[in-house]
C-alpha cells in the first residue's frame, strides 16, 4: 500500500491490524526505513525493513524465496535451517546481495525464488545491474543444516550445500568463506558495503534430532546444540 498516494495518506498495517505510523524525523523528513518501505520492489525482493537496535543499523529481513541487493550501508539479515543463503559481494563497487533458497531446483511456477537454480541467477543478475562484474565477485555461503531428523536418507541441507558450491564453481565465483551443514540453525547478518558477515548459531529447536545424536553417543554434539550458540565473523 502506497502511503504517499494523493488524498488522505493510508498508514501501513501490522499483521495484528494495528496502524503503524511512519517515523518522522526533525524537519518533517521520513526515516530511511520508511523511505525504503515506500519504494516499489521487484517480485521476490525482500521488503521487510526495520531498525536493528543491536547493530544500530537499518536492516532488511530476507524470507525464504526472497533476495536483496544493495550498495547502501545497511544490514541484510536472514535465519536459516536447511536452507542456503549465498552472500555475494563485489568490493570494486562496494555492493552485495543475499538470497535464501529452500531446494536446489523444482518445477513449480509459484515461489520460484525458493529454488537455488533461479535464486542464484537472480542474485547475480541484480548485482550486475548495480555495476558489479562476475570477475570481481566473491561469495560467502551459509546454511544447509540437518535440522530435521526425517531427512536422513536424502538430507535437504546437504543437497542445497552441494548445489550452491557446484553452481559457484561453474560460474567461477570464488567461495572465500562458508559455514554450512552441522545441525544448528543460523542467524546471518550481511553488510553489503563491506562484505562482512556475522553468523550466530542458534540453539537447536528440534529435540527429535538431539535424540538421534544422544542414541549415537555424540555427547559433545548434544551439549553444543543445546548451548546458547556462538557468533563468528566471516
UniProtKB/Swiss-Prot annotation:
<comment type="function">
    <text>Probably deamidates glutamine residues to glutamate on methyl-accepting chemotaxis receptors (MCPs), playing an important role in chemotaxis.</text>
</comment>
<comment type="similarity">
    <text>Belongs to the CheD family.</text>
</comment>
<dbReference type="InterPro" id="IPR005659">
    <property type="entry name" value="Chemorcpt_Glu_NH3ase_CheD"/>
</dbReference>
<dbReference type="InterPro" id="IPR038592">
    <property type="entry name" value="CheD-like_sf"/>
</dbReference>
<dbReference type="Pfam" id="PF03975">
    <property type="entry name" value="CheD"/>
</dbReference>
<dbReference type="GO" id="GO:0006935">
    <property type="term" value="P:chemotaxis"/>
</dbReference>
<keyword id="KW-0145">Chemotaxis</keyword>
<dbReference type="InterPro" id="IPR011324">
    <property type="entry name" value="Cytotoxic_necrot_fac-like_cat"/>
</dbReference>
<dbReference type="GO" id="GO:0050568">
    <property type="term" value="F:protein-glutamine glutaminase activity"/>
</dbReference>
<protein>
    <recommendedName>
        <fullName>Probable chemoreceptor glutamine deamidase CheD 1</fullName>
        <ecNumber>3.5.1.44</ecNumber>
    </recommendedName>
</protein>
<keyword id="KW-0378">Hydrolase</keyword>
Amino acid at each position: 500500500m502506497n502511503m504517499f498516494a494523493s488524498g488522505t495518506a493510508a498508514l501501513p498495517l501490522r499483521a495484528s491490524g494495528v496502524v503503524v505510523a511512519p517515523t518522522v524525523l526533525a524537519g518533517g523528513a521520513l526515516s530511511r526505513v520508511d523511505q525504503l518501505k515506500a519504494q516499489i520492489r521487484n517480485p521476490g525482493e525482500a521488503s521487510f525493513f526495520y531498525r536493528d537496535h543491536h547493530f544500530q543499523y537499518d536492516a532488511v529481513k530476507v524470507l525464504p524465496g526472497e533476495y536483496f541487493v544493495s550498495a547502501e550501508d545497511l544490514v541484510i539479515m536472514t535465519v536459516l535451517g536447511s536452507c542456503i543463503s549465498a552472500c555475494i559481494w563485489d568490493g570494486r563497487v562496494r555492493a552485495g546481495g543475499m538470497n535464501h533458497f529452500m531446494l536446489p531446483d523444482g518445477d513449480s511456477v509459484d515461489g520460484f525464488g525458493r529454488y537455488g537454480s533461479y535464486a542464484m541467477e537472480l542474485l547475480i543478475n541484480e548485482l550486475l545491474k548495480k555495476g558489479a562484474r562476475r570477475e570481481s565477485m566473491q561469495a560467502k555461503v551459509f546454511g544447509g543444516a540437518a535440522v530435521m531428523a526425517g531427512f536422513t536418507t536424502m538430507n535437504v541441507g546437504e543437497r542445497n550445500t552441494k548445489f550452491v558450491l557446484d553452481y559457484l564453481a561453474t560460474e567461477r565465483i570464488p567461495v572465500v568463506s562458508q559455514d554450512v551443514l552441522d545441525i544448528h540453525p543460523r542467524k546471518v547478518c550481511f553488510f553489503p558495503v563491506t562484505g562482512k558477515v556475522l553468523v550466530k548459531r542458534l540453539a537447536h529447536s528440534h529435540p527429535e534430532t538431539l535424540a538421534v545424536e544422544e542414541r549415537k553417543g555424540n555427547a559433545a554434539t548434544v551439549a553444543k546444540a543445546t548451548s546458547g550458540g556462538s557468533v563468528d565473523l566471516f
